[in-house]
């Protein structure tokens, strides 16, 4: 039975209560307050829902992740990185990045990043949890991504690209920076061909929970401001 969250508590059900079909649906309801979102990521779940649906919280099994040491850089991407074809900044314009991620895609109907979601993650950014990566081409924003950093873990949320390999360029740059900062895992949530091409793979929900247990509260060397 699906658990409905109450507004007067931030508690989530145990991850093992998540449904098998649809894979990982853990709870519904609640709100998108900053405190609830922080608790959700610490617990191992994330919000994902379409317009007209209640807020839905997910913890899929298996979980798609990328270990920084396993980043795969294709020949074409490596060439762009070596030439520093694009310029990358961090936390320069979070609002522009999440707005671009929310824009309709040619291959999808609508967007799950509603205005309410944008406001919620902007609050997380203002509190120092959510961060953006901007990819520029001669001063024009052509790609980027955003997510949350907690301890030695980064929780990726969404990315966009307006130029060839721009989002991959930003992601690869971020991964190398996270590696230098002592991060051990990047949560990619759901599998996609795009992520797998970069080296992402699946681990079990218990494995993912173990990383949360051991790395959420450890310090990192992150310095986000560019």
Curated annotation (Swiss-Prot):
InterPro entries: Acyl_CoA_acyltransferase, Leu/Phe-tRNA_Trfase, Leu/Phe-tRNA_Trfase_C, Leu/Phe-tRNA_Trfase_N. Its main location: cytoplasm. It comes from the Bacteria. Pfam families: Leu_Phe_trans. One of its GO terms (biological process) is protein catabolic process. It is found in: Cytoplasm. It is an enzyme of class 2 (transferase). Signal peptide: none annotated. Its EC number is 2.3.2.6. One of its GO terms (molecular function) is leucyl-tRNA--protein transferase activity. SUPFAM superfamilies: Acyl-CoA N-acyltransferases (Nat) (SSF55729). Keywords: Acyltransferase, Cytoplasm, Transferase. HAMAP family: Leu_Phe_trans (MF_00688). Belongs to the L/F-transferase family. Functions in the N-end rule pathway of protein degradation where it conjugates Leu, Phe and, less efficiently, Met from aminoacyl-tRNAs to the N-termini of proteins containing an N-terminal arginine or lysine. PANTHER family: LEUCYL/PHENYLALANYL-TRNA--PROTEIN TRANSFERASE, LEUCYL_PHENYLALANYL-TRNA--PROTEIN TRANSFERASE. This is Leucyl/phenylalanyl-tRNA--protein transferase. It comes from Pseudomonas fluorescens (strain ATCC BAA-477 / NRRL B-23932 / Pf-5). The gene is aat.
